[in-house]
Design a protein with these regions (language model features):
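S-adenosyl-L-methionine
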Residues: 1-18, 57-86
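Conserved class I S-adenosyl-L-methionine
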Residues: 20-29
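Conserved SAM-binding loop of SAM-dependent methyltransferases across substrates and taxa
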Residues: 30-42
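Conserved SAM/SAH-binding beta-strand->alpha-helix loop
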Residues: 53
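A short SAM/SAH-binding and catalytic strip from SAM-dependent methyltransferases
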Residues: 89-104
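A short glycine-rich, Lys/Arg-flanked "PGG" loop and its adjoining helix->strand segment in the class I
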Residues: 107-119
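Conserved beta-strand signature within the Rossmann-like core of class I S-adenosyl-L-methionine
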Residues: 117-127
Length: 127
């Protein structure tokens, strides 16, 4: 489900700009939230975009050539981030429709996201 600009900007407000730590985005799709993160001042080089759809991955690589685009499954986040994340993330931002998944799958994704995060860093989710 595509994100509106206002929602994307609201989500981006929770991400710290003055950091060098990576920002992980789950399910970026066509980049609505990604754009909001960049407009907020997040350097593309900090972005780790985890996208399942190969077509969206190609689009994201074209639109954000300095971001790290990972074709992977956010619901298998540890595997998807294994080689992509070189430091604890300053934020995980998710546009995934979590409520459509069974509770155990949702909880696993959230646990894995917190493992990837630096202490005190936000997990930002809308559903």
């Amino acid at each position: 489900m595509p994100s509106g600009r206002l929602l994307a900007r609201t989500m981006a407000q929770y991400v710290v700009v003055d950091s060098n730590a990576p920002v992980v985005e789950l399910g970026p799709g066509t980049g609505a939230i990604t754009n909001a993160l960049i407009e907020r001042g997040i350097d593309q080089k900090r972005l780790v975009l985890v996208e399942y759809n190969p077509g969206f991955c190609a689009l994201l690589r074209d639109r954000y050539p300095h971001a790290k685009v990972v074709q992977g499954d956010a619901y298998r986040l540890r595997d998807s981030l294994r080689e992509a994340l070189d430091a604890p993330a300053s934020a995980v931002v998710s546009g995934l429709p979590l409520v459509t998944k069974p509770m155990q799958i949702r909880l696993k994704l959230i646990r894995d996201a917190f493992v990837a995060l630096a202490p005190g860093a936000p997990f930002v989710q809308f559903t």
